[in-house]
UniProtKB/Swiss-Prot annotation:
Its main location: cytoplasm. NCBIfam families: hemH. Its EC number is 4.98.1.1. This is Ferrochelatase. Keywords: Cytoplasm, Heme biosynthesis, Iron, Lyase, Metal-binding, Porphyrin biosynthesis. PANTHER family: FERROCHELATASE (PTHR11108), FERROCHELATASE, MITOCHONDRIAL (PTHR11108:SF1). It is found in: Cytoplasm. Signal peptide: none annotated. It comes from Picosynechococcus sp. (strain ATCC 27264 / PCC 7002 / PR-6) (Agmenellum quadruplicatum). The gene is hemH. Fe cation binds at H196, E277. GO terms for molecular function: ferrochelatase activity; metal ion binding. CDD domains: Ferrochelatase_C, Ferrochelatase_N. It comes from the Bacteria. The keyword Transit peptide does not apply.
Length: 386
């Protein structure tokens, strides 16, 4: 089989407070995150958003220690994965490639090229596929393969998603049971799945399978859990003026409180590592929302991190992928079914959906604000807001 490598893909996160603004810039400069009608608008808008959001985001990171633990956790997952595969007689080297912060995907590929591998397994640490997560990283890699003749000599395979892998489901069930058992009446606690949201148009227009995979994953977990508890699936982390997948986490928590729910356990279903959206958004912001709504006992299931069953599921995914026909970028990022990796460019026109039009109008507003910030003149300065 020769020298085998595994490339773990993840979002990345700022290591310290000074990294927050450039991290946000990298995030919003990704055309898979924000859809714009012309590529030249991407970086100016990313600069504006990252500048406006940096202060609030830094305050959030201060609440969890001043930086994201995502890099350390991902590296620990990589170490545990290599050890598990070694126990099974499969020697691999594991690399970590982050999309928006160090170690960037490009850094990982540079190391891979130096190591002169024979085979590479590309494994995103996103259980469910979305064009804005795994898809974005795949597009970066696809372009590198297209333009680098050395990479073209490397055999590779992609693992697009693994939300239905039995050991992943078992690991989630194990953690959920542990939290449920902390309640006086475990079967009466409401189970609340909170997934990272995406704009509704990604699903309806671009054919993103994310919502379907999230819903199927939730059902598989509840079936394996085998408990009578009521449960809810909602979506968090909405950004911007357009409609995202619903129901929203905050609205759902308030509604459950109004219905008289007192015991609640939250499961971060789309995250496998602790980071800002579990440690700050769920543990602090949503806990406060829940308590104000009358929910008395708020618990959260920890992220999988290096849970033994989770690491074993990753190891099985790797070994299975090495025995199967390779999955290529063309198969994953350019499928025959109705899914388009959004977009590197959108055409202008009035015949698109209202949501896209609203997004474009919002983009124009952002650009107008950018001009006012640069010029120091405009209506916001006139009324004293700026």
């Amino acid at each position: 089989m020769g020298r085998v490598g595994v490339l773990l893909l993840n979002l990345g996160g700022p290591d310290k407070l000074e990294d927050v603004r450039p991290f946000l810039f990298n995030l919003f400069a990704d055309p898979e995150i924000i859809r714009l009608p012309a590529p030249w608008m991407q970086k100016p808008l990313a600069w504006l958003i990252s500048t406006l959001r940096a202060g609030k985001s830094q305050e959030n990171y201060k609440e969890i220690g001043g930086g994201s633990p995502l890099r350390q956790i991902t590296e620990a997952q990589g170490t545990a994965l290599a050890q598990k595969l070694a126990e099974w007689g499969q020697e691999v080297k594991v690399y970590v490639g982050m999309r928006y912060w160090h170690p960037f995907t490009e850094e990982a590929i540079a190391e891979i090229k130096k190591d002169d591998l024979d085979q590479l397994v590309v494994l995103p640490l996103y259980p469910q596929f979305s064009i804005s997560t795994s898809g974005s990283s795949f597009r970066v890699l696809e372009e590198m393969w297209r333009t680098d003749k050395d990479l073209n000599q490397l055999d590779y395979t992609l693992i697009p998603s693994w939300y239905d892998h039995p050991q992943y489901i078992a690991a989630m069930v194990d953690l959920i049971r542990q939290e449920l058992d902390q309640f006086d009446n475990p079967d009466q606690a409401h189970i609340f799945f909170s997934a990272h949201g995406v704009p509704q148009s990604y699903v309806e227009e671009a054919g993103d399978p994310y919502q379907r995979e999230i819903e199927e994953c939730t059902k598989l977990i509840m079936e394996a859990l085998g408990r009578p508890n009521d449960y809810t699936l909602a979506y968090q982390s909405r950004v911007g003026p357009v409609e995202w997948l619903q129901p929203y986490t905050e609205d759902s928590l308030i509604a459950l409180g109004e219905k008289g729910v007192k015991d609640l356990v939250v499961i971060p279903i789309s995250f496998v590592s602790e980071h800002i959206e579990t440690l700050q958004e769920i543990d602090i912001e949503y806990r406060e929302v829940a308590e104000e709504a009358g929910i008395e006992n708020f618990r959260r299931v920890p992220a999988l991190n290096t849970h033994p069953l989770f690491i074993e599921s990753l190891a099985n995914l790797v070994t299975d992928s090495l025995e199967q026909c390779p999955r290529t970028f063309g198969q994953v990022t350019h499928p025959k079914e109705n899914m388009k990796m959004y977009p590197q460019e959108l055409s202008w026109g009035m015949n698109t959906s209202a949501e896209v039009l609203n997004g474009r109008l919002a983009m124009i507003g952002f650009l107008a604000l950018l001009l006012e910030l640069i010029s120091g003149q405009g209506p916001l300065h006139f009324v004293g807001i700026m």
